[in-house]
């Protein structure tokens, strides 16, 4: 009998939940990330955070700053800094496009989520975003509450 082929399902590893609330997302791009083996193991265990992280373009390379990856507890060879800069892997054309987009005033590169693709490689979804003002945030909260109330009313009838 032939064996059933098992499909690997990879779930989303980390998500920057505040990003969609604090920023207006204009464009997104998926990038690879350069990590060491022990860092990948920590991310698979969910011991990483994208809060307060951002990306910069320096000398034609994209770098991710302030991404917290807790050191893997069974790693005895090297101890890495949890918030070190990590290189993002993009094509030159994509980097040039991002550079032209963020050259506008008030735009930034913000990571939205990190996930494992079907091949098991860690990918990062970056967004070109513009910061929201306080009144925009209040409007978002109002809209969310109105949607919730509508759903409750629909459920009753």
Swiss-Prot record:
InterPro entries: SmpB (IPR023620), SsrA-bd_prot (IPR000037), SsrA-bd_prot_CS (IPR020081)
Membrane-spanning segments: none
The family this protein is said to belong to: Belongs to the SmpB family.
The organism's place on the tree of life at top rank: Bacteria
Subcellular location: Cytoplasm
Keywords: Cytoplasm, RNA-binding
Main location: cytoplasm
Keyword Iron in annotation: no
HAMAP family to which the protein is assigned, alphabetical: SmpB
Protein name (database record): SsrA-binding protein
């Amino acid at each position: 009998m032939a064996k059933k082929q098992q499909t690997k399902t990879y779930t989303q590893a980390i998500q920057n939940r505040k990003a969609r609330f604090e920023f207006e997302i204009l464009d997104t791009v998926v990038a690879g990330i350069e990590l060491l083996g022990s860092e990948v193991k920590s991310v698979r265990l969910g011991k990483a955070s994208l809060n307060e992280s951002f990306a910069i373009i320096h000398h034609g390379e994209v770098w991710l700053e302030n991404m917290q990856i807790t050191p893997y507890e069974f790693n005895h060879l090297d101890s890495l800094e949890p918030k070190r800069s990590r290189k993002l892997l993009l094509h030159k054309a994509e980097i040039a496009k991002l550079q032209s987009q963020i050259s506008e005033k008030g735009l930034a590169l913000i990571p939205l989520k990190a996930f494992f693709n079907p091949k098991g490689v860690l990918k990062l979804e970056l967004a070109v975003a513009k910061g929201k003002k306080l009144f925009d945030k209040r409007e978002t909260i109002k809209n969310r509450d109105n949607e919730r109330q509508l759903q409750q009313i629909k459920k009753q009838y």
